[in-house]
Amino acid sequence: KHLLLVLCFCLFPLSTLAQDHSLLTVERIFNSDEFAERKFGPARWLEKGAGYTTLEPSNTIETGTDIVRYDTRSGKRKVLVSAEKLIPDGLKNPLDIDNYEWSHDKKNLLIFTNTKKVWRYHTRGDYWVLNLQTWKLNKVGRAAKPSTLMFAKFAPDGSMVAYVREQNIYVEDIAGTKIVQLTSDGLGNIINGTSDWVYEEEFGLRNGFRWSPDSRHIAYWHFDTNGIKTFYMINNTDSLYPQLIPLQYPKVGTIN
């Protein structure tokens, strides 16, 4: 009985400390959302500055996100695209939006999701087009492997979407029924529509193609990195032993 009583008194202060919210603990920092940063955006201005759109947590779906509009004069809030509209056929959860773009005519929405990092930034992922009149979701580049599309963007007339897929440039119609591959030499040391490590790292160049204003042409970067020698970086953090990361890196007086 005496031992049990002593244990009860010993455990009481511990339970009290665990409930003390003034005490900063590893559990509170890393195993809860208590200190998660509050993010704003991505935000998109609407025409003539009448309002802007941004992302906010859904009130109806725990893991969902709504796209909302704020009027710049009145501050009035309106949900334009609810999380319920972002659930693809056959799935239970809505798309996790990393970024989005409105078509110029505001009839379609391009959604960037399921992203992966390329060197420093999450520039590779999946894209979906949401028809804002029928609320139908179409996946861009349906035949592509998951998280392999980059820098998708609407044509100015809103009729097509262009993107980089595995170092080549593709164009498809909004409904996704017709896909045209514009380049076919992208492989290994040939890169179309984006850049190699050096140009991203040193110059911040990543998004390497643009539509013409009339939606009839696309201008793009074409990189031929053949002949550039390899520089090896050492990764000491991701595994027990160091790993070598080969990068093509030109130096003064060498091929670039």
Question: What is the predicted function of each stretch?
Answer:
Residues 2-12:
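Sec-dependent N-terminal signal peptides
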Residues 18-256:
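Beta-propeller folds
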